[in-house]
């Protein structure tokens, strides 16, 4: 990594930047650093936005195309063909974690490189329940609860009763159960229940929301863990079997809508805060656990492993985000490759 000896080969490619805004600019900047031409897209509403201005200033005659929607896969493929793109970077959001889209990019008659994990890995790790089952098979700790999609109301209620009983047996003062859309993400499709008598109505609401938003009624029932740190492990892998981590981030400061507001790196810093547990040991454990999953599936791009760490220092894996993220720049700031800083994780991903 950071040895761009293949740059002459890279220059034979053109990257379709299938996104907008901040991440589109980061992708274009990485392409410029690597000497790769790019093609950006924009909608009528975005004609004066930053990524459009950047593409006009730094791109060539095929650097910018107008589309009707960032969500129209057919239109993206058409732009790729017209401009001669050989690779596509989805950024985050939109198609970034859509394994069907990634498969289409690589399997179409005029195939392109999908700059992200393989579609099979996105499919495997993109489902929280698949990830949970894989983690448990490797001895990686996960939040107590179901490890497969639940579609039956009675089955879901039985699981919820077991989770409530588990918390009562462990003298948890205010037992709570989370009902989560298994295909959800970004804090969407999650509600909590503190009374089993209220379970069915909340379950139906989450199930209906999941069907509308994610086209999948699958629901995950888990213990609601209170008073925790939300810690992330930044992973990067290549297609030659190498996976490494770029440290940890703490994103516990979030809005009421579970949107991250502040990222701190590393995940714990005993020189700043005092902890009731061995914070260095916990960070070592979660990076080791994260890499074990990455190596098991042959992870081959940038990704983030999301963890809950309780106030007693017990870590539980929540999910894997199979994409580049807004906060990847925080990890880059605390990392070095062969003693050199100035890391660009988007460039490394490409």
Predicted regions and their residues:
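Acidic/histidine-enriched active-site and ligand-binding environments that engage anionic O-linkages
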Residues: 160-179
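N-terminal cationic-hydrophobic initiation segments that often serve targeting/anchoring roles
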Residues: 80, 164-168, 211
